[in-house]
Amino acid sequence: MKYDHLLVRYGELTLKGSNRKKFVNQLRNNVNKSLKGLDGFVVKGKRDRMYIELEDHADINEITYRLSKIFGIKSISPVLKVEKTIEAISAAAIKFAQQFEENSTFKIDVKRADKNFPMDTYELQRELGGAVLKHFDNISVNVKRPDHEIRVEVRLDAIYMYEEVVPGSGGLPVGTGGKTLLMLSGGIDSPVAGMEVMRRGVTIEAIHFHSPPFTSDQAKEKVIELTRILAERVGPIKLHIVPFTELQKQVNKVVHPRYTMTSTRRMMMRVADKLVHQIGALAIVNGENLGQVASQTLHSMYAINNVTSTPVLRPLLTYDKEEIIIKSKEIGTFETSIQPFEDCCTIFTPKNPVTEPNFDKVVQYESVFDFEEMINRAVENIETLEITSDYKTIKEQQTNQLINDFL
């Protein structure tokens, strides 16, 4: 079947009332960004639907795949746009039925948004079903469990006919909910947390703490790859890589071993807080999960949060670990996250970290060195990368260059 349009159904933005225009415009911008590099289409965003007009050479499968990854889209259907005459609609229904297997069953489903159309829903269903049965003697009607369903939408401008409904990602268009800073460690949880807030329309930039030589270049490239996977859905994402070695070594030198984990995360939060204000973000996001590890008890979260007045969002707070793993597999980050390259959260891990840190004690331990100067130095030396869906690490670039030189 050669389709001439894609019908894009909106997600929750249909509930946004007077703000709907803002949401539709943002979604249209996101669609155009996602489809960059492809041609043969025109995007037309309307109040209740988006239509993508396709030229003959358009790559409909690739366009549909990219659309399915965009937040704010409920579903996509390849459709035929048909004139509002019974002859044209019947001919299109027969065209659909030509693809059906022998002895298969079908039904006609009609939705009539144009109430001025001369035939009501049931009349049109009977007319089209009759036309198909008259043309083919090896298929039959089954309205309860059909093998095929020809869907007909009677709109004001035309008739749209389709069979397939491709699920979208739902949620709200990214860019309608403000900006946040995602603390991206390289583990399983934080990329999922980032995806969860983006699904609510929030834009993210990411911050990663890198402690060479204790953390490797492979750990850094792993985080770049996780950011690239997130960028496939929303376009370019800025990744801020913090040189954290000096701070981390000092914490492990002067803070009691049981409190190093708490203090290290307080330092991370202080750095993130400064960056939040620099980039104009409204909140910090992390992948913390209540009770999962020593630093993620309520007592620990209280001690760590105390260093910032910026809201800290924890989308995964009450998830089971298995739920998080399932989500990471769904979004395509799991295999990268489990690569065995240590990040700064796993090095210097004490054998017996405190789970209910005494707030006064951690403040006392930190008072013996000038961490503020070190934090400022770390912020000043942040490396910022803009990661796109086709971003290649330095290693990949060098490999490609060697291959090209060899050829």
From Swiss-Prot:
The EC number(s) this enzyme carries: 2.8.1.4
Name of the featured protein: Probable tRNA sulfurtransferase
Principal subcellular localisation of the protein: cytoplasm
Family under the similarity heading: Belongs to the ThiI family.
InterPro entries linked to this entry: Rossmann-like_a/b/a_fold, ThiI_AANH, ThiI_fer, ThiI_N, THUMP_dom, THUMP_ThiI, tRNA_STrfase, tRNA_sulfurtransferase_ThiI
Catalytic activity: [ThiI sulfur-carrier protein]-S-sulfanyl-L-cysteine + a uridine in tRNA + 2 reduced [2Fe-2S]-[ferredoxin] + ATP + H(+) = [ThiI sulfur-carrier protein]-L-cysteine + a 4-thiouridine in tRNA + 2 oxidized [2Fe-2S]-[ferredoxin] + AMP + diphosphate; [ThiS sulfur-carrier protein]-C-terminal Gly-Gly-AMP + S-sulfanyl-L-cysteinyl-[cysteine desulfurase] + AH2 = [ThiS sulfur-carrier protein]-C-terminal-Gly-aminoethanethioate + L-cysteinyl-[cysteine desulfurase] + A + AMP + 2 H(+)
GO biological process, one term: thiamine diphosphate biosynthetic process
